[in-house]
């Protein structure tokens, strides 16, 4: 006759009463407590949005994504690609409340857009500053992937300063300082929140670049300007120079003479553009613009907002080993 094996459960020194809620809280590790706290704080401010837009063949296309309430009167941040061609839309919140939304403005070159709820919405989320993020820092993504409302994933900042090439009409640009994270993102997360451990929104989730790799547009001083322009004008006015460039390191002698380690090599100057009219030539090495050092396309783009349109735009370039001063007058970039 076989006998069942006997197992002795060691005494943990506590009585056998059922665990209390306080016991459960104490058992949670610090990581879980942070994620839970941020999820509970951020989720009410994030909406699932459904958008209806027209295809070229006249048929209607229904898309979905996420949006984040960021003002007390119902304005929400999302991605420009989520609301492209929108005819109508609806936002649904975690508490079950719904509202129709209207498009306020979109900027394809930053992949940011603003929509407004036509009925009362939950209070706004708190916006943070992505410039304070560090690689390895914990971040929490809240969105509506695959139609699953209020989904939360957590990960770390895998990289900072990444760039996403984007195109709007005939213009190409890069979204600068993009946040790379390993927090799981899926279709429907676009437009959702990326929050830090204090529940502040530091990014708007925008793309899935591959398995285990998500990207978010940062919330920082540059994007705050974009958001302000969308609220005010429904679009972002940008200045246009008309050049194609690539960053290169300076040789040792140039570093000594200029005090810079990098510059922008001009690859192409567009015919008839402000850059050509200024005298800029292919092969020139741009060192400074408006008196500020430039070492990447992003650093130059940051200077080309509406206030630069039609105004003198000083350029310092290195040409054949000599420093040359040029003055360009940027025009307004067309929206087409």
Language-model segments: which ranges?
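Residues at or immediately preceding the N-termini of alpha-helices
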Residues: 130, 220, 272-274, 297
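PDZ-domain C-terminal substructure recognizer with occasional recognition of PDZ-binding tails
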Residues: 228-235, 265, 277-281, 287-293, ...
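PDZ/PDZ-like domain micro-motif
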Residues: 190-193, 249-257, 270-288, 303
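Short, structured beta-strand/loop micro-motifs enriched in basic residues and often containing a Trp
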Residues: 119-124, 264-270, 293-297
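Serine-dependent protease modules
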Residues: 2-262, 305, 321, 332-336
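A structural signal for short, hydrophobic beta-strand segments that form beta-sheets
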Residues: 103, 157, 266-269, 286
């Amino acid at each position: 006759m076989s006998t069942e094996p006997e197992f002795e459960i060691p005494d943990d020194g506590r009585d056998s009463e059922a665990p209390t809620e306080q016991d459960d809280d104490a058992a949670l590790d610090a990581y879980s407590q942070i994620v839970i706290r941020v999820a509970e704080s951020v989720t009410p401010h994030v909406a699932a949005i459904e958008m209806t837009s027209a295809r070229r063949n006249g048929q209607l296309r229904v898309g979905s994504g996420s949006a984040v309430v960021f003002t007390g009167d119902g304005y929400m941040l999302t991605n420009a690609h989520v609301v492209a061609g929108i005819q109508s839309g609806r936002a649904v919140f975690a508490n079950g409340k719904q509202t129709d939304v209207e498009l306020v403005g979109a900027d394809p070159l930053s992949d940011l857009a603003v929509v407004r709820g036509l009925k009362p919405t939950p209070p706004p989320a708190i916006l943070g500053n992505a410039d304070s993020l560090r690689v390895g820092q914990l971040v929490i993504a809240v969105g509506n992937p695959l139609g699953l409302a209020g989904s939360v994933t957590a990960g770390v900042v895998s990289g900072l300063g990444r760039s996403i090439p984007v195109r709007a009409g005939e213009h190409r640009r890069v979204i600068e300082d993009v946040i790379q994270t390993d927090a799981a993102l899926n279709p429907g997360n676009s437009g959702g929140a990326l929050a830090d451990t204090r529940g502040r929104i530091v990014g708007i989730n925008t793309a899935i670049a591959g398995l285990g790799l998500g990207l978010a547009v940062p919330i920082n001083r540059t994007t705050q300007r974009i958001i302000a322009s969308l609220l005010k004008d429904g679009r972002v006015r940008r200045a246009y120079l008309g050049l194609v460039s690539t960053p290169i390191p300076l040789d040792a002698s140039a570093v000594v003479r200029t005090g810079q380690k990098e510059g922008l090599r001009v690859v192409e100057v567009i015919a008839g553009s402000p850059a050509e009219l200024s005298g800029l030539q292919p092969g020139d090495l741009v060192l400074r613009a408006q008196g500020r050092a430039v070492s990447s396309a992003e650093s130059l783009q940051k200077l080309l907002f509406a206030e630069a349109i039609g105004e003198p735009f000083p350029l310092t370039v290195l040409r054949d080993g000599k420093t040359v001063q040029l003055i360009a007058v940027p025009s307004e970039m067309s929206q087409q």
